[in-house]
């Protein structure tokens, strides 16, 4: 039997790039909560003792950017300089301007256009992917890497492992078999966890706790065998972390945000962008389309691409590939997708309820993946049943 290895990684919410994603989306939430028509393109960067937010925001909302930055960092666990950042005493820099009027008139005609006429905020192409290898219809390597990262945070915050600090990374390698285009996971080849820790804990304690409290609850025992390799803090020491260890920037973790290297990616990041930015809304609706194809039993694996021109409402192209796993021809699946999904930006915002912010709606997406999440706020995970015409 011919097999292959595939690897996906994740980082948890204390990673500096992910801190930036969460700050950008917390600001988006605050703007949309008060003004659903807000136009937001918010970037964040961070390094030792400093967080800066910058970009273009046009909104009627009253937003305290500095408070959002500090609250977000504090919520992650950055409460003192020795863990990587002190939320209450770090420098917060804000350099935010209004959206360019050239972009504004081309995209939304200064809010005079009907929803179906609103043009895409930029050019670009986005991909959605789904696979039947997990209940979430997501790649297993990505699901486990992501869940290991989330579990690391959980056992840090509930004090199961009090020696943990906020920053951390995970990586999972799985041995697969290709079943005529469908992916069949066989076993875990390697699990890698690198987590920030305090000065007191030993490497033996780290390895023991990670196996017992992080890996065991996430990865089913039947996928682990005597040949599974564990690299648990292989560098030996990871005390300095967060923005103190590495600079962070919004939009640096786009594969972790999506499918862990499976499928494809058009290159556009998500966080800090309102729904007129098709980098985000376009990627969300093609995930819904691909997931619906697989959930409806039309294919075991599916990728969907959509592309846009700035200021133009209708997509330039829609593409589908089922990797030869389709129960009907791909061209018929494409017809079904076009009949059931409206790819115009204004309509995506309405149909997926993307103008609703606040209550951590977008901030939640900014750590542990935008897809495969069981949460009603992740409206793009709702399956539409697709019935081919007899």
UniProtKB/Swiss-Prot annotation:
<comment type="subunit">
    <text>Homotetramer.</text>
</comment>
<dbReference type="Pfam" id="PF02773">
    <property type="entry name" value="S-AdoMet_synt_C"/>
</dbReference>
<feature type="binding site">
    <location>
        <position position="277"/>
    </location>
    <ligand>
        <name>ATP</name>
    </ligand>
</feature>
<feature type="binding site" description="in other chain">
    <location>
        <begin position="235"/>
        <end position="238"/>
    </location>
    <ligand>
        <name>ATP</name>
    </ligand>
</feature>
<dbReference type="GO" id="GO:0004478">
    <property type="term" value="F:methionine adenosyltransferase activity"/>
</dbReference>
<dbReference type="GO" id="GO:0006556">
    <property type="term" value="P:S-adenosylmethionine biosynthetic process"/>
</dbReference>
<dbReference type="InterPro" id="IPR022629">
    <property type="entry name" value="S-AdoMet_synt_central"/>
</dbReference>
<keyword id="KW-0460">Magnesium</keyword>
<dbReference type="InterPro" id="IPR022630">
    <property type="entry name" value="S-AdoMet_synt_C"/>
</dbReference>
<keyword id="KW-0547">Nucleotide-binding</keyword>
<dbReference type="InterPro" id="IPR022631">
    <property type="entry name" value="ADOMET_SYNTHASE_CS"/>
</dbReference>
<feature type="binding site">
    <location>
        <position position="269"/>
    </location>
    <ligand>
        <name>ATP</name>
    </ligand>
</feature>
<dbReference type="GO" id="GO:0005737">
    <property type="term" value="C:cytoplasm"/>
</dbReference>
<keyword id="KW-0963">Cytoplasm</keyword>
<comment type="pathway">
    <text>Amino-acid biosynthesis; S-adenosyl-L-methionine biosynthesis; S-adenosyl-L-methionine from L-methionine: step 1/1.</text>
</comment>
<dbReference type="GO" id="GO:0046872">
    <property type="term" value="F:metal ion binding"/>
</dbReference>
<keyword id="KW-0554">One-carbon metabolism</keyword>
<dbReference type="GO" id="GO:0005524">
    <property type="term" value="F:ATP binding"/>
</dbReference>
<feature type="binding site" description="in other chain">
    <location>
        <begin position="167"/>
        <end position="169"/>
    </location>
    <ligand>
        <name>ATP</name>
    </ligand>
</feature>
<feature type="binding site" description="in other chain">
    <location>
        <begin position="252"/>
        <end position="253"/>
    </location>
    <ligand>
        <name>ATP</name>
    </ligand>
</feature>
<comment type="similarity">
    <text>Belongs to the AdoMet synthase family.</text>
</comment>
<keyword id="KW-0067">ATP-binding</keyword>
<comment type="function">
    <text>Catalyzes the formation of S-adenosylmethionine from methionine and ATP. The reaction comprises two steps that are both catalyzed by the same enzyme: formation of S-adenosylmethionine (AdoMet) and triphosphate, and subsequent hydrolysis of the triphosphate.</text>
</comment>
<feature type="binding site" description="in other chain">
    <location>
        <position position="246"/>
    </location>
    <ligand>
        <name>ATP</name>
    </ligand>
</feature>
<dbReference type="InterPro" id="IPR022636">
    <property type="entry name" value="S-AdoMet_synthetase_sfam"/>
</dbReference>
<dbReference type="GO" id="GO:0006730">
    <property type="term" value="P:one-carbon metabolic process"/>
</dbReference>
<feature type="binding site" description="in other chain">
    <location>
        <position position="99"/>
    </location>
    <ligand>
        <name>L-methionine</name>
    </ligand>
</feature>
<feature type="binding site" description="in other chain">
    <location>
        <position position="15"/>
    </location>
    <ligand>
        <name>ATP</name>
    </ligand>
</feature>
<dbReference type="InterPro" id="IPR002133">
    <property type="entry name" value="S-AdoMet_synthetase"/>
</dbReference>
<feature type="binding site">
    <location>
        <position position="273"/>
    </location>
    <ligand>
        <name>ATP</name>
    </ligand>
</feature>
<keyword id="KW-0630">Potassium</keyword>
<keyword id="KW-0808">Transferase</keyword>
<keyword id="KW-0479">Metal-binding</keyword>
<dbReference type="InterPro" id="IPR022628">
    <property type="entry name" value="S-AdoMet_synt_N"/>
</dbReference>
<keyword id="KW-0170">Cobalt</keyword>
<feature type="binding site">
    <location>
        <position position="246"/>
    </location>
    <ligand>
        <name>L-methionine</name>
    </ligand>
</feature>
<feature type="binding site" description="in other chain">
    <location>
        <position position="56"/>
    </location>
    <ligand>
        <name>L-methionine</name>
    </ligand>
</feature>
<dbReference type="Pfam" id="PF00438">
    <property type="entry name" value="S-AdoMet_synt_N"/>
</dbReference>
<feature type="binding site">
    <location>
        <position position="43"/>
    </location>
    <ligand>
        <name>K(+)</name>
    </ligand>
</feature>
<dbReference type="Pfam" id="PF02772">
    <property type="entry name" value="S-AdoMet_synt_M"/>
</dbReference>
<feature type="binding site">
    <location>
        <position position="9"/>
    </location>
    <ligand>
        <name>Mg(2+)</name>
    </ligand>
</feature>
<feature type="binding site" description="in other chain">
    <location>
        <position position="277"/>
    </location>
    <ligand>
        <name>L-methionine</name>
    </ligand>
</feature>
């Amino acid at each position: 039997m011919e097999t292959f290895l595939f690897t996906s990684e994740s980082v948890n919410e204390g990673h500096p790039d992910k801190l930036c994603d969460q700050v950008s989306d917390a600001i988006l939430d605050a703007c949309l909560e008060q003004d659903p028509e807000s136009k937001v393109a918010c970037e964040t960067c961070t390094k030792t003792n400093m967080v800066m937010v910058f970009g273009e925001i046009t909104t009627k909302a009253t937003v305290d950017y500095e408070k959002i930055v500090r609250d977000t960092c504090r919520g992650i666990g950055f409460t003192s300089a020795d863990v990587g950042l002190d939320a209450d005493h770090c420098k917060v820099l804000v350099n935010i301007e209004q959206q360019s009027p050239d972009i504004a008139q081309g995209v939304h005609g200064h809010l005079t256009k009907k929803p179906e006429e609103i043009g895409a905020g930029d050019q670009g192409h986005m991909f959605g992917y789904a696979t039947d290898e997990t209940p979430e219809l997501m790649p297993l390597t990505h699901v486990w890497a992501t869940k290991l990262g989330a579990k690391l945070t959980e056992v840090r915050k509930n004090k199961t492992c009090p020696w943990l600090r906020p920053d951390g990374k995970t990586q999972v390698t799985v041995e697969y078999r290709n079943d005529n285009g469908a992916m069949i996971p066989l076993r875990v080849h390697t699990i890698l966890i690198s987590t920030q820790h305090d000065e007191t804990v030993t490497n033996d304690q780290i390895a023991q706790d990670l196996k017992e409290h992080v890996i065991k609850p996430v990865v089913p025992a039947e996928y682990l065998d005597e040949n599974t390799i564990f690299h648990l803090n292989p560098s030996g020491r990871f005390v300095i972390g967060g923005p103190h260890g590495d600079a962070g920037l919004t939009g640096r973790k786009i594969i972790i945000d999506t499918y862990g290297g499976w499928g494809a990616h058009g290159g556009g990041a998500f966080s800090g962008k309102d729904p007129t930015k098709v980098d985000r809304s376009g990627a969300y609706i093609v995930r819904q389309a691909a997931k619906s194809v697989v959930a409806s039993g039309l294919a075991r694996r599916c990728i969907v691409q959509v592309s846009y021109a700035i200021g133009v409402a209708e997509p330039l192209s829609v593409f589908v590939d089922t990797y030869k796993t389709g129960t009907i021809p791909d061209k018929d699946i494409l017809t079904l997708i076009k009949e059931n999904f409206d790819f115009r930006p204004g309509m995506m915002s309405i149909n997926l309820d993307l103008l609703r912010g606040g209550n951590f709606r977008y901030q939640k997406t900014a750590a542990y993946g935008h897809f495969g999440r069981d949460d009603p706020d992740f409206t793009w995970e709702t399956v539409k049943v697709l019935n081919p015409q007899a």
